Regions:
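Transmembrane alpha-helical core residues of multi-pass small-molecule transporters
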Residues: 62-66, 144, 156, 160, ...
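Helix-loop-helix units of permease transmembrane domains in multi-pass membrane transporters
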Residues: 113-147, 151
Length: 291
């Protein structure tokens, strides 16, 4: 029979009871530095999420392949089949729109996944616990995603633009305004399109459903307009053509699909207004609904 060991003396409790002068109770002082959280912390958290998720790299990789690959392929085919002087009045930047039309689906998908995937996995509860301000969480997601989407799109379209100008030797030289619209303008527009997808993902809370809705919004107006043959539907047909997303994207390359509708920088202001309205609605819903 072994002799029981005497109890070990307890370690002294750290003196965290600093107390304030004149207070009858001691005040607790945390051994860990405590700082007031702000938007920068939420942005840092969302940046860690978006760059550590494997789907981000895959989606952006496919986007680069589509935009650059199709843009260069179209330019090469046009140059190979063009006769002398046939491209004299064409803007060489305009051939980059074909790859961007398909590539925008990747940005839409990534935008939806940035928010909706957290609802699918349940991680949104952890996110909201760490940052109880729901509007701050959505704002941080929007800022990080917009920065990523704009940067990748701008680099892609700039590479395609420079390559197409050198490949299409018979085309005219783009003006400064055309360079701005064909690189900066279209990049902002695609990033805003992805931002609308992000907001829709937070509203729908279902990845497949939100992606389907966004692809429908991109393609359905143009497809529906093609089947409106009657004269009574001519007004609706023209509106669908003029304000469809493919038509608005083509405006940045001065090759609009229609003679009417938005011109110049109008598509960018339209997208900005729709994004602001959608974001305000999403914040309102986020404040009222449980996660």
């Amino acid at each position: 029979m072994s002799t029981p060991q005497p109890p070990m003396p307890q370690a002294a409790v750290p003196d965290w009871q600093g107390g304030t002068a004149g207070s009858p109770y001691g005040g607790y002082t945390s051994p860990i530095p405590v700082v007031r959280t702000h938007l920068g912390h939420a942005i840092a958290s969302e940046w860690t999420k978006i760059r550590s998720v494997r789907s981000t790299m895959w989606t952006l990789g496919v986007f680069l392949v589509l935009v650059v690959g199709i843009g260069l392929l179209v330019a090469a085919l046009v140059e190979a089949n063009a006769s002398e002087g046939s491209l004299a009045g064409d803007n060489p930047l305009s051939f980059g729109v074909f790859g961007l039309l398909l590539g925008s689906i990747c940005i839409i998908t990534l935008g939806v996944l940035t928010t909706a995937s957290e609802y699918g996995t349940g991680m949104i509860r952890t996110t909201m616990t760490a940052c109880p301000s729901r509007s701050r969480v959505l704002a941080a997601k929007a800022i990080v995603f917009f920065a990523v989407a704009f940067s990748v799109t701008f680099v892609s379209v700039l590479l395609v633009a420079l390559a197409d100008v050198s490949i299409l030797s018979g085309a005219r030289s783009p003006s400064t305004q055309e360079w701005l619209k064909g690189t900066l303008g279209i990049s902002l527009y695609v990033a805003l399109l992805g931002l609308i997808s992000l907001v829709l993902g937070s509203v729908i809370r279902h990845s497949a459903g939100a992606i389907t809705i966004m692809i429908g919004l991109v393609l359905a107006p143009l497809v529906l307009a093609l089947f409106m043959f009657t004269e009574s539907l001519s007004g609706l047909r023209d509106a669908l053509f003029n304000y469809s997303i493919p038509s608005q994207m083509s405006v940045f390359y001065t090759t609009s699909l229609t003679n009417d509708g938005p011109t110049g920088w109008d598509p960018l202001w339209i997208a900005l207004g729709v994004t602001a309205a959608a974001f305000a609605g999403a914040v309102s819903l986020l404040q009222k609904r449980d996660v």
